[in-house]
Amino acid sequence: MSSRTIMAFDFGTKSIGSAIGQEITGTASPLKAFKAQDGTPNWDDIEKQIKEWQPDLIVVGLPTDLHGKELDVITPKAKKFANRLHGRFGNQVELHDERLSTVEARADLFEFGGYKALSKGNVDCQSAVVILESWFESQWG
């Protein structure tokens, strides 16, 4: 088992959640949510986080419907975001199915903090945690 550091993003047009995890443990922790305008974040803020954590790989959640079919509007924007991450920072970037990650994130947050924990930023970051932990599970098959 590798000891790579992996960063994940839960892409959204208004907010992009992030998380960090270690492949050796298969666990992830929330980082921060970045405000975005139509899916475009402040790239300087993203760069600071990438420089701070120096991930070996970045995972971006791929929005799909319940059947795994790509969505017309948001899926291409998430792919564009992933391509821009790779182009700007040179990191290897993988897309990973994010089906139901927000539902699971909301349930996790509510369990530990009630309604007060359900802020948009918290949900987006916890969604990134769910995406990353799901990616870890998919690697261990």
From Swiss-Prot:
GO terms for cellular component: cytosol. It is an enzyme of class 3 (hydrolase). The keyword Hydrolase applies. InterPro entries: RNaseH-like_sf (IPR012337), YqgF (IPR005227), YqgF/RNaseH-like_dom (IPR006641), YqgF/RNaseH-like_dom_sf (IPR037027). GO terms for molecular function: nuclease activity. It comes from the Bacteria. Keywords: Cytoplasm, Hydrolase, Nuclease, Ribosome biogenesis. The keyword Cytoplasm applies. Its main location: cytoplasm. Its EC number is 3.1.-.-. GO terms for biological process: rRNA 5'-end processing. It holds the Pfam family RuvX. Could be a nuclease involved in processing of the 5'-end of pre-16S rRNA. Belongs to the YqgF nuclease family. This is Putative pre-16S rRNA nuclease. It comes from Aliivibrio salmonicida (strain LFI1238) (Vibrio salmonicida (strain LFI1238)).
